Amino acid sequence: MKDALNERQVNLICVGAQKSGTTTLYTILTKHPEFTFARIKEVQYFATDPYTADHRKYHANYRGRVLRRWIADFTPRYLAHPEAASRIAAYNPDTHIIILLRDPVQRAISHYQMKIRNGNETRSFAEVVRSDTEALKHEMTVETGQSVVGRGLYAAQIARYDALFPRNQIHLMRFDDLVKHQEVTVNALLSELGSTSITLTETVHANPAFEPQLKRVWKVVSRLPMVYTARLRMVLRNQSRRSIAQTTPPVDEATLKVLRAFYREDQLALQTRTGWDLSDWI
């Protein structure tokens, strides 16, 4: 079988974090002329266990695509997966890595809400936090793959990539910056990648929290000119927020304090690694 990438390799991977804006960034970059994406957003190749290095199978996800400068894979599971970094490095050590980070407490809440909506969680947020933090305290290594809390231990996860890739290939971004200053933030990334800048005519809100029926409506509406759909877009977003509020249990302040305390050491390490002021996260 002929290799779908014609001797080329995937050279740009957004590894996470989950619930931190990866879908928004993906949506923006799919419109950029220098990027090629797989037929599905999350290929999951390097997070599949048991793992077999079958690169032709991986490349088949790009079959029929026009191959541009950056051949990209956006799979948020890769940041938390304990073996993904080493698998990516073995595949292509020249890969550029994008890591989007969000306040870990807010990320955990969003992750929990997603699991509730999908029917994968029935416990209260307090019960999930209690269970996850106890399990992680007793782990000799940070195994975060299935953990709502563990996925927010960013410094420990980034360290795996730092050990295998040079710093100029690791591109760190903040979720808040992507939300509040979208064009500036995306263009800063594009500058680091040596790619041309973009102009956004509207702010992108790729919202995987939409209920399935709302997703289908949004997909149609998002293709129509903003001038005709601004009010409808607002209605859909408000409906999505109400739906989320109705389907997820409340989060109590005491649990948030427990979570902040649990993340503190990792956040201080992340602050040192990034040079960011993370006082609003700690």
Residue ranges and their predicted role:
Residues 32, 42-43, 75-76, 151, ...:
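Generic secondary-structure boundary/loop-capping signal
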Residues 34, 67, 113, 198, ...:
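Generic structural signal for secondary-structure transition and capping sites
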Residues 52-64, 120-202:
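PAPS-dependent sulfotransferase catalytic domain
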Residues 159-257, 261, 276, 281-282:
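The conserved 3'-phosphoadenosine-5'-phosphosulfate
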